[in-house]
Swiss-Prot record:
GO biological process assignments: translation
An example molecular function term from Gene Ontology annotations: structural constituent of ribosome
Annotated InterPro entries: Ribosomal_uS2, Ribosomal_uS2_bac/mit/plastid, Ribosomal_uS2_CS, Ribosomal_uS2_flav_dom_sf
Database matches in HAMAP family: Ribosomal_uS2_B
Name of this chain's protein: Small ribosomal subunit protein uS2
Record-stated family: Belongs to the universal ribosomal protein uS2 family.
A GO CC annotation given for this chain: cytosolic small ribosomal subunit
Keywords of this entry: Ribonucleoprotein, Ribosomal protein
CDD domains: RPS2
Domain of life: Bacteria
């Protein structure tokens, strides 16, 4: 049984790609048709590739892989943080700092500084410092937490990276590839899929689509670490009585949405 149904994908808008003029020809094989100037992603392929991504992530987690979730645009930020935390992993959901992976030593120093500032507040050091200095420290902490809070406790460079919109996160993908870190990604019709190891053809601009795919991969991690019975299934994504099983039904839905 597929880990994500056709109906779930349709309801989340996973099938809507970009305007045809913005497409990347390398995504042609993942596109079913075009409607009103918008490419429609072939959801039968999305179902297949989502299954493969789920298996990949589950198996990686079963081998104690460290997974980094990356999604810095507003449509992805909340889901990336929530699902990374739920699955006991790590995330970056604000601007990717160049060298986050390839200059990990420097990043670790900044993380150490963040932890030092937190300790200063907890042990009472703030109480004996001038207010102006405390204000500066709080400002520094806020900035460090914004960019590094999601990887503050990451024990090492990740074994796997999951990316929402690799077109936007090109620097992150390049760093991962340089270090030999496999990349799992939601890939829209405007993206070059060549640098992605495990592709999920999908609309990466809709909040519900991002949430659906990201939550399912978090489920895979939980299953890999704790077993299938431990997977927490989101109620809104639970299988319903009806299924959209054919490409023809997808086209009917798309045409209806664009009518």
């Amino acid at each position: 049984m597929a880990v994500i149904s056709m109906k779930q994908l349709l309801e989340a808008g996973v099938h809507f790609g970009h305007q045809t003029r913005r497409w990347n020809p390398k995504m042609a094989k993942y596109i079913f048709t075009e409607r009103n100037g918008i490419h429609v992603i072939d959801l039968q392929q999305t179902v297949k590739y989502a299954d493969q991504a789920y298996d990949f992530m589950r198996d990686a987690a079963a081998n104690d892989a460290v997974v980094l979730f990356v999604g810095t645009k507003k449509q992805a930020a909340d889901a990336v943080a929530e699902e990374a935390v739920r699955s006991g992993q790590y995330f970056i959901n604000h601007r990717w700092l160049g060298g986050t992976l390839t200059n990990w030593g420097t990043i670790q120093k900044r993380i150490a500084r963040l932890k030092e500032i937190k300790r200063m507040e907890e042990d009472g050091t703030f109480e004996v410092l001038p207010k102006k200095e405390v204000a500066l420290l709080n400002k520094q902490r806020a900035r460090l937490e914004k960019f590094l809070g999601g990887i503050e406790d990451m024990p090492r460079i990740p074994d796997v990276m999951y990316v929402v919109d690799p077109h936007k996160e090109q620097i992150a993908v390049k760093e991962a590839k340089k270090l030999g870190i496999p990349v799992v990604a939601m890939v829209d019709t405007n993206t070059d899929p060549d640098d992605i190891d495990v592709i999920i053809p999908a609309n990466d601009d809709a909040i519900r689509a991002v949430k659906l795919i990201t939550a399912k991969l978090a489920d895979a991690i939980i299953e890999g670490r704790q077993g299938e019975d431990a997977v927490a299934v989101e109620a809104e994504f639970a299988a319903s009585e009806t299924q959209a099983d054919s490409i023809e039904e997808i086209v009917e839905v798309v045409e209806g949405d664009n009518a």
